[in-house]
Amino acid sequence: MFSYFHPEEEFQVWKVENYCHRCPHAVLDISFNDGERYRGMFEAAYDSENGGDLDIEMDDPRYDEFHQIVFEISEIIHDGPRRYRTYLSIDYRDFPTLITDINTGETVYSAQTDPSRT
């Protein structure tokens, strides 16, 4: 059984990470709600926190821990406000709406079937 920092991670980051471990050479098409879109391959996954981003300590009520997935970007389909160039990090705070395997056409993640988004 997995331990999640946030309940939605089960249906988002962990679902995608598990797929990437099963299909390590998959090239994924990663789309965000605002039209921003990338293609890339799984690079890494790790637990992270926002203390450095906000320059805060663990006892600050804004402090948050979460699991992140990192993709090496092979193609920028549609650029947007995130401005990623080489690596794309995703976590529950700004998760894509659709992730598909471009080789198999399989939907790896869809916000439409994510129970944490309904």
Q: Which residues make up each language-model segment?
A:
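Conserved RNA-binding domains used in RNP assembly and mRNA/RNA metabolism
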Residues: F2-T118
